[in-house]
């Protein structure tokens, strides 16, 4: 039989009682973690958001409460009244925050029963993720996930307090907006009152926050939900949360200074870690040269070395031909990895092929300093000496080579560097290394579309000294853009924006957007730029990805209350779902069968 709560009021959380409460009468409420019957005396571990308290039920003290306790099972919801007492000698549990005390129960109310859960409500439970996501309301009872979400709340509060104290104003921007098909695909929402027309869910509040700067708000922020209909991976979701900021009358340095201080405040208050400021700054060109990627993991060395000048005239045709075709040859020195088996090297070769590399040449440095490799015979002693010097080769090292286009050689070896960092245990989760990456290319050439595309977005300003390049050599122009990278993940990215209508029109033109198209898609922005737009810039941080790193989680789904799968489905609510024909008719939509 289920009891009613009645006039009972909780006095303490389960995890908050301590030895200082000994002798006090308390009222606790929560879920039964486990029940143990010791031949008359029954012990219940009662759990809530803050922890676990041990309850002791003695039939001599309250027969009715004891009788109810005999019927409770795991995950039953109960409320108890009792006296906090010190645990008997020898029964103290140092692993529990409440391990010095227990509650001698005088009254118990059984507030609800529970079916047997499909998995134990424990942190180290071994259960398939799809089962956990299907029963997310049970999964979220586990202390680790609750801790992650409580920490997420604290981070959001710290960010808000910092930005409020730094002169920012929180402003909400529209969720139903206009589709601007640059970048990832939009999620579209049909308009019932405007048949045949669609809203788009925002990929970011980009244009609206720029308009707020034109409006004179000076400093804006928002912790905002954004949406992208893109292929997913471990650290991406179709809906995600950004810490979004925009500032007027600033340069890049101002924004980086303010934002790294915000991140330092988060790390100090959450982890007790004092970050060294200013954070390192490297250019995109330097990052690609040293690490092969624009989001380098700075926790370990393994830097890449270009040897194109040595390889261009060597006898190994793969290397020489790559350079002659305008490509590059780079190597990575995996220190003391010459013991890798052929299978391990084959696995590394398969890994780089994911990123377009055709293969992976290797050299093992023997104890006498000589090369052991299928390609050794193609190199002269002088070339070998030059490569060893460039690589810093030592006996026991493994040299790994990529010869391809600039993009493929860098990305394949750069990703391999990150992979080896994990494989060799060089990337500790409790080691936090930041870097600002700056001076990205403004544009890149899309060979398939036969036009330039923005590396970041079309509203990014070029460096002042590169504005002239827009007329003759736009591919060489650099952007006033900056990304904040933490342990190989981009956690934030932004730029100084174009605030001059003429330059914005030029940018659209370089991207193959006609004046008519620009007016149709972005006329409201261009109009605003005609009415005294101030110099401005901003940044957005991925809160989900930041939380993933702060908590040491392997999946972004562990820091989001109700996440989607990698197929963008919600196993709990079974979204997305079908809608009936009546709803579709109201929206002037007709079903079409897709031919796969």
Curated annotation (Swiss-Prot):
InterPro entries: Aa-tRNA-synt_II, aa-tRNA-synth_II, aa-tRNA-synth_II/BPL/LPL, Asp-tRNA-ligase_1, Asp-tRNA-ligase_1_N, Asp/Asn-tRNA-synth_IIb, AspRS_core, GAD-like_sf. Keywords: Aminoacyl-tRNA synthetase, ATP-binding, Cytoplasm, Ligase, Nucleotide-binding, Protein biosynthesis. It is an enzyme of class 6 (ligase). PROSITE patterns: AA_TRNA_LIGASE_II. The keyword ATP-binding applies. Residues 206-209 are annotated as: Aspartate. Its EC number is 6.1.1.23. The record marks 38, 90 as: Important for tRNA non-discrimination. Disulfide bonds: none annotated. Signal peptide: none annotated. Its main location: cytoplasm. ATP binds at residues 228-230, 237, 490, 542-545. L-aspartate binds at residues 182, 228, 456, 497. One of its GO terms (biological process) is aspartyl-tRNA aminoacylation. GO terms for cellular component: cytoplasm. GO terms for molecular function: aspartate-tRNA ligase activity; aspartate-tRNA(Asn) ligase activity; ATP binding; nucleic acid binding. It is found in: Cytoplasm. It catalyses: tRNA(Asx) + L-aspartate + ATP = L-aspartyl-tRNA(Asx) + AMP + diphosphate. Belongs to the class-II aminoacyl-tRNA synthetase family. Type 1 subfamily. Homodimer. NCBIfam families: aspS_bact, PRK00476.1. Aspartyl-tRNA synthetase with relaxed tRNA specificity since it is able to aspartylate not only its cognate tRNA(Asp) but also tRNA(Asn). Reaction proceeds in two steps: L-aspartate is first activated by ATP to form Asp-AMP and then transferred to the acceptor end of tRNA(Asp/Asn). This is Aspartate--tRNA(Asp/Asn) ligase. It comes from Syntrophotalea carbinolica (strain DSM 2380 / NBRC 103641 / GraBd1) (Pelobacter carbinolicus).
């Amino acid at each position: 039989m289920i009891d009613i709560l009645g006039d009972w009021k909780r006095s303490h959380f389960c995890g908050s009682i301590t030895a200082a409460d000994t002798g006090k009468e308390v009222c606790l409420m929560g879920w039964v973690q486990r029940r143990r019957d010791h031949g008359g005396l029954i012990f219940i571990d009662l759990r809530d958001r803050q922890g676990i308290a041990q309850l002791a039920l003695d039939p001599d003290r309250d027969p009715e409460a004891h009788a109810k306790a005999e019927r409770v099972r795991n995950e039953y919801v109960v409320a108890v009244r009792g006296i906090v007492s010190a645990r008997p000698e020898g029964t103290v549990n140092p692993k529990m925050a409440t391990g010095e005390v227990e509650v001698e129960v005088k009254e118990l109310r059984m507030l609800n029963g529970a079916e047997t859960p499909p998995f134990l409500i424990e942190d180290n439970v071994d259960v398939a993720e799809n089962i956990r996501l299907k029963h997310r309301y049970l999964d979220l009872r586990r202390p680790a996930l609750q801790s992650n979400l409580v920490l997420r709340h604290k981070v959001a509060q710290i960010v808000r307090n910092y930005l409020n104290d730094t002169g920012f104003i929180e402003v909400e921007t529209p969720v139903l907006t206009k589709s601007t098909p640059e970048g990832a695909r939009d999620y579209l929402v049909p308009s019932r009152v405007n048949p045949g027309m669609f809203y788009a869910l925002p990929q970011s509040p980009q244009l609206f926050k720029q308009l707020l700067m034109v409006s004179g708000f000076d400093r804006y922020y928002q912790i905002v939900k954004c949406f992208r209909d893109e292929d997913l991976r471990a650290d991406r979701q179709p809906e995600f949360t950004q810490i979004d900021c925009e500032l007027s009358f600033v340069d890049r340095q101002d924004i980086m200074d303010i934002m790294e201080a915000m991140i330092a405040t988060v790390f100090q208050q959450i982890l007790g870690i004092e970050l060294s400021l200013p954070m390192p700054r490297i250019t995109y060109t330097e990052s690609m040269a040293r690490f092969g990627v624009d989001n380098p993991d700075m926790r370990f060395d393994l830097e890449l070395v270009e040897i194109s000048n040595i390889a261009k005239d060597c006898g190994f045709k793969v290397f020489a031909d790559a350079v002659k075709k305008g490509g590059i040859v780079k190597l990575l020195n995996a220190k003391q990895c010459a013991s890798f088996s052929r299978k391990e090297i084959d696995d590394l070769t398969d890994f780089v092929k994911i990123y377009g590399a055709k293969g992976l040449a290797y050299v093992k440095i023997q104890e006498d300093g000589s090369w052991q490799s299928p390609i050794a015979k193609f190199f002269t002693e002088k070339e070998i000496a030059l490569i060893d010097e460039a690589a810093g080769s030592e006996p026991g090292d493994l040299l790994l080579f990529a010869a391809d286009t600039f993009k493929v050689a860098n990305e394949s070896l750069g990703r391999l560097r990150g992979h080896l960092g994990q494989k060799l245990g060089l990337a500790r989760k409790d080691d936090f290394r930041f870097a600002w990456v700056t001076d990205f290319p403004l544009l890149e050439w899309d060979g398939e579309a036969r036009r330039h595309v923005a590396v970041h977005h079309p509203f990014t300003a070029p460096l002042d000294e590169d504005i002239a390049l827009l007329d003759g050599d736009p591919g060489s122009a650099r952007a006033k853009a900056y990304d904040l990278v933490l342990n190989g993940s981009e956690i934030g990215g932004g730029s100084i924006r174009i605030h001059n209508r003429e330059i914005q029109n030029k940018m659209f033109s370089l991207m193959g957007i006609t004046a008519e198209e620009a007016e149709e898609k972005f006329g409201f922005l261009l109009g605003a730029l005609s009415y005294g737009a101030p110099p401005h810039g901003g940044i957005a941080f991925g809160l989900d990805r930041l939380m993933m790193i702060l908590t040491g989680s392997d999946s972004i789904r562990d820091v989001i209350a109700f996440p989607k799968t990698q197929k963008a489905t919600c196993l709990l609510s079974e979204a997305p779902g079908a809608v009936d024909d009546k709803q579709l008719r109201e929206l002037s939509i007709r079903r079409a069968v897709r031919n796969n």
